[in-house]
């Protein structure tokens, strides 16, 4: 397996006086802010990265209908209608998606979608009028859909004709994140006096390692 990597870079600055006088730990605060910025960029790359000097996102691999699935592509299951679900048959489409996944992967599987898709899914009901989406059963737990947890990823596409807006699978087995060295911080008090520069870098890569471990719901007939 070979996965492309990217280097994330940031160089926040603070005055030496602020670092000396601040009531809070400025070094730690800057580190946390940079980590958050890096995490946002990583999340986008893991979903939609083109693999050119960055991770290859799982949505950029070839997609093929599950009936013609072959290693090296991501299998898709049709929702039954362009840009949505067939009226009254949303649960059937989700069941087809769940059982497109082999049993060994379903145990730790979850749904992944963005917040707009999740808002639409939360309104789905079964034939008895019960919501398919269920709130967390306890503090710290996740909401579930069809008995599986949901993960929100803003980088996933919206529901639209031919879009693959919902992913389902065991993502720990599906997608490998390569973290080369963690975050490195070089503190530079000389180059831009009176500012102290925090030269911050991180190398990260990623790509699909097991094409059997996740499937996509394609909103098509």
Where are these regions (language model features)?
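Structured, hydrophobic secondary-structure cores that serve as assembly/anchoring elements
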Residues: 1-221
């Amino acid at each position: 397996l070979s996965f492309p990597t990217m280097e994330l870079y940031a160089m926040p600055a603070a005055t030496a006086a602020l670092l000396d006088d601040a009531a809070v730990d400025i070094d730690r605060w800057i580190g946390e802010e940079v980590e958050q910025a890096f995490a946002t960029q990583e999340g986008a790359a893991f979903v939609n990265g083109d693999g050119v000097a960055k991770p290859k996102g799982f949505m950029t691999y070839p997609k093929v209908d599950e009936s013609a699935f072959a290693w090296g592509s991501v299998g898709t299951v049709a929702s039954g209608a362009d840009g949505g679900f067939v009226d009254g048959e949303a649960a059937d489409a989700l069941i087809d998606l769940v059982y497109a996944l082999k049993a060994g992967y379903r145990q730790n599987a979850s749904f992944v979608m963005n917040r707009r898709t999740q808002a639409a899914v939360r309104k789905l009901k079964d034939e008895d009028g019960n919501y398919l989406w269920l709130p967390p059963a306890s503090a710290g737990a996740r909401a579930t859909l069809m008995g599986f947890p949901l993960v929100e990823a803003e980088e996933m596409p919206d529901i639209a004709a031919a879009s693959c807006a919902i992913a389902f699978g065991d993502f720990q087995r599906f997608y490998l994140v390569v973290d080369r060295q963690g975050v490195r911080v070089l503190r530079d008090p000389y180059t831009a006096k009176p500012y102290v520069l925090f030269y911050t870098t991180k190398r990260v890569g990623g790509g699909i390692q097991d094409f059997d471990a996740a499937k996509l719901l394609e909103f098509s007939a």
